């Protein structure tokens, strides 16, 4: 893709593919020092409805002294896009990241993730701490705090109603309408080059990304299944979600979908935690607040 190369020709982006044991092929962009074998590796994991390109401002910053690998999750952009909902179970996406890291050479210096990429990476950090030295997560809640908020907090329940809409059959067809207007409205102000990049990604298909919502047990109650969110909380075992990897949370406090309450009690589930809140920042802080985000990440990586 030409867009980021035109913005930062010195990045020398390379394309790489990773093949998993269950036949999934994951597309990635790689950049960084030519002596990649000596440079520590950072793995970037995007969310919905984005792809590797969402990290372009971080790639420009950290490729100066790190080998940077930004993947497309299964179901997104140039990675494999199985159509069945069951192919997007969280355990399978965690296994995808394990395969990528093992092929890169475990452990990576850090996993840096956002939104759905963060959800998968929270599980990776809890289940496979040996695969990463550090974990950075941007506006993506821990499963336990998210489940509790969906069950008990009216404001977060209201903010998360979009999840139930996306879970409906045919939601991806609606997202395509009017040149992806709903998705562009969601992402906010973009340049013409950025719009072209996202449009090209979405033209590969949206079903995979939407299937993440369909398969997830974490969503607000529906009229058909009242009380389900509370049942999910009761079924969760906190010890399985305990994170011991040194973790840096970067949180935009004005995110309309993921509210600050999702950080309440997070220290109970992460033993080595730093939290940096950005007032006035929303959900897309890697792009909209890149300077501050990059400063926080760099300081944490060096600590």
Where are these regions (language model features)?
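Flexible "cap/lid" subdomain of the alpha/beta-hydrolase fold that forms the substrate-access gate
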Residues: 3-15, 24-26, 32-36, 41, ...
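Glycine/alanine-rich phosphate-binding loops at beta-alpha junctions
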Residues: 21
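Structural cue for short, hydrophobic secondary-structure segments
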Residues: 44-47, 70
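Active-site glycine-rich loops that stabilize anionic/oxyanionic intermediates
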Residues: 47-50, 115
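Serine-hydrolase catalytic-loop signature spanning alpha/beta hydrolases and amidase-signature enzymes
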Residues: 49-57, 68
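A short acidic, amphipathic alpha-helical/loop segment
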Residues: 57-58, 262-265, 292
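Active-site machinery of serine-nucleophile hydrolases
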Residues: 63-72
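Catalytic histidine-centered segment of alpha/beta-hydrolase-like enzymes
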Residues: 281-294
């Amino acid at each position: 893709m030409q867009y980021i190369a035109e913005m930062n020709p010195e990045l020398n982006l390379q394309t790489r593919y990773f093949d998993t044991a269950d036949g999934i092929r994951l597309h990635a962009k790689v950049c960084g020092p030519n002596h990649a074998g000596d440079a520590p590796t950072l793995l970037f994991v995007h969310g919905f409805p984005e792809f590797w390109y969402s990290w372009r401002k971080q790639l420009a910053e950290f490729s100066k002294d790190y080998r940077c690998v930004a993947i497309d999750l299964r179901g997104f952009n140039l990675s494999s896009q199985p159509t069945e909902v069951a192919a997007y179970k969280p355990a399978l996406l965690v296994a995808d990241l394990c395969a990528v890291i093992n092929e890169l050479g475990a452990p990576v210096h850090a996993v840096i993730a956002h939104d759905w990429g963060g959800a998968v990476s929270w599980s990776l950090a809890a289940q496979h701490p040996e695969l990463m030295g550090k974990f950075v997560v941007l506006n993506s809640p821990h499963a336990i705090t998210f489940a509790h908020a969906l069950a008990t907090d009216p404001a977060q329940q209201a903010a998360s109603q979009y999840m139930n809409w996306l879970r409906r059959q045919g939601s991806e067809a609606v997202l395509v309408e009017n040149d992806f207007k709903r998705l562009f409205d969601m992402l906010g102000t973009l340049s013409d080059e950025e719009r072209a990049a996202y449009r090209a990604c979405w033209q590969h298909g949206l079903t995979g990304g939407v299937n993440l919502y369909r398969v997830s047990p974490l969503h607000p109650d529906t009229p058909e299944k009242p009380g389900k969110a509370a049942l999910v909380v009761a079924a969760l075992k906190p010890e399985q979600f305990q994170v011991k990897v040194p973790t840096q949370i970067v949180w935009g406090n004005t995110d309309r979908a993921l509210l600050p309450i999702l950080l309440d009690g997070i220290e109970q589930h992460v033993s080595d935690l730093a939290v940096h809140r950005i007032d006035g920042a929303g959900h897309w802080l890697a792009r909209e607040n890149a300077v501050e985000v990059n400063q926080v990440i760099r300081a944490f990586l060096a600590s």
